[in-house]
């Protein structure tokens, strides 16, 4: 079972992801956070397999949180989610240690495949 933490400052995005991911037989959502700081605490407590992390958030953005998370909790892989698809954002996410980067408007099948692949390679 792939254990996930969802991190996004929009409750509707977290709710939509949770509803879609929990119907997958090999996935379970174990926690949710609305910013990078909350995510850091949850990841240290729950040690999920995958963290689905939004890029743009208040308090601590997803890229900064990913860099700190990779240093403190390397067993959890981070899959970045963003509405922005520019090369610079992707490069910063990968430099911070993200396992993958998925555009929010992409097909759910791509996100599911990315989660499964990141879980296998973490």
Feature locations, PLM:
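A short, hydrophobic beta-strand element within the central beta-sheet of small alpha/beta folds
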Residues: 75-85
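Acidic catalytic/metal-coordinating carboxylates
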Residues: 35-38, 60-64
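C-terminal output helix
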Residues: 88, 106-119
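The feature encodes the CheY-like receiver
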Residues: 58, 86
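Active-site residues of response regulator receiver
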Residues: 8, 54, 82
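Short amphipathic alpha-helix used as the core "switch/output" element in two-component signaling
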Residues: 41, 63-74
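Acidic, metal-coordinating helix/loop segments flanking the phosphotransfer/catalytic sites
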Residues: 32-50
């Amino acid at each position: 079972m792939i254990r996930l933490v969802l991190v996004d400052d929009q409750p509707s995005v977290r709710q939509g992801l949770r509803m879609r991911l929990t119907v997958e037989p090999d996935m379970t959502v174990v926690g949710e956070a609305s910013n990078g700081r909350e995510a850091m605490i949850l990841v240290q407590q729950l040690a999920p397999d995958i963290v689905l992390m939004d890029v743009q958030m208040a308090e601590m953005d997803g890229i900064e949180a990913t860099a700190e998370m990779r240093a403190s909790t390397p067993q959890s892989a981070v899959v970045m989610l963003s509405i922005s698809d520019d090369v610079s954002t992707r490069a910063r996410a990968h430099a911070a240690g993200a396992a993958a980067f998925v555009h929010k408007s992409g097909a759910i099948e791509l996100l599911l495949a990315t989660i499964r692949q990141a879980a296998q390679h973490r």
